[in-house]
A protein has these predicted regions:
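Transmembrane helix-loop-helix hairpins at the membrane interface
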Residues: 112-269
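Specific transmembrane helices
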Residues: 1-128, 155, 224-272
Length: 272
């Protein structure tokens, strides 16, 4: 399944963690929403984790370049071709379908700047909430209370497995040989554990599901903004670069003793 219908289905699928967590909290979880961290959070945390997530994406694209995963094309042709394809799927011509006064180049500028800034707030926090309310806001704490490594490693793998169905509704840019597909899966599994750990850290540090949603969607949107000027040469190298970047992120948090926030957070919630 691909094209417009695949995109709609993917958007609906992204809300399933929030729906599952909502129903579980309403009918099967005695504390209900008392530990859901639905507080707005501190403004400085929004700024802090927006900048950190933006930086992580920037470093990942540097690694893509160094590893030969991408080449750069600052004409924006990559974005313009994708935009034209999206309109073609619906049977529309790009020039005729754009709002009056808008050109494809203007759309490129709007999407680039928006992906780095305002799109991460509206609708970013709303779309990011769909995953975070379920995964970091409910699944992660439940697993962590069993054993910390279960919350981190098993939680990360479950989050990774949850993403796999998206491959069937979102068209893939390239078809890879079996060995590359297998290697990709292993690399992405490790990368997912690291990314899950980073987002769980944001959740425990900020104690706000909305700050966590912002951190998550900022990585997604800034990656999209950079991708408008990047031509993929080797998908495996790109995925390796992303995983190495997230490993570096977790290593920095570890050596700065920032990961101790988990023990502090769960001790506080247990006594509270």
């Amino acid at each position: 399944m691909a094209g417009q219908y695949g995109a709609y289905l993917a958007q609906g699928y992204m809300m399933t963690p929030a729906i599952a967590a909502l129903l579980t909290r309403l009918f099967f979880y005695p504390p209900k929403f008392s530990d859901a961290n639905l507080r707005f959070g501190r403004l400085k945390d929004y700024l802090k984790f927006w900048l950190i997530s933006l930086g992580i994406t920037g470093v990942s694209y540097i690694s893509f370049t160094v590893l030969g995963g991408i080449t750069w094309d600052f004409s924006g042709r990559v974005f313009l071709d994708k935009l034209a394809q999206q309109f073609a799927v619906t049977g529309q011509d790009i020039q005729a379908a754009l709002p009056p006064g808008f050109t494809p180049s203007m759309m490129l500028l709007i999407y680039t700047i928006g992906g780095l800034t305002v799109f991460n707030v509206i609708p970013g926090i709303i779309t990011g909430f769909g995953e975070e309310f379920g995964h970091r806001g409910f699944m992660f704490p439940m697993l962590y209370k069993i054993k910390p490594w279960i919350g981190i490693i098993i939680g990360g793998l479950l989050w990774y497995l949850w993403h796999i169905p998206l491959a069937f509704v979102i068209p893939q840019a390239t078809k890879l040989p079996f060995w590359q597909t297998t290697l990709n899966l292993l690399i992405l599994a490790l990368g997912s554990i690291c990314t899950h750990t980073y987002l769980a850290y944001v959740y425990a540090k900020s104690e706000s599901i909305f700050v966590t949603a912002l951190a998550h969607i900022t990585m997604n949107n800034t990656a999209a903004s950079f991708s408008y000027y990047a031509v993929i040469q080797n998908q495996v190298a790109c995925n390796l670069g992303l995983t190495l970047t997230m490993l570096l992120t977790i290593a920095i948090l570890y050596f700065r003793k920032e990961l101790r926030v988990f023990a502090k957070y769960f001790c506080a919630t247990k006594t509270g």
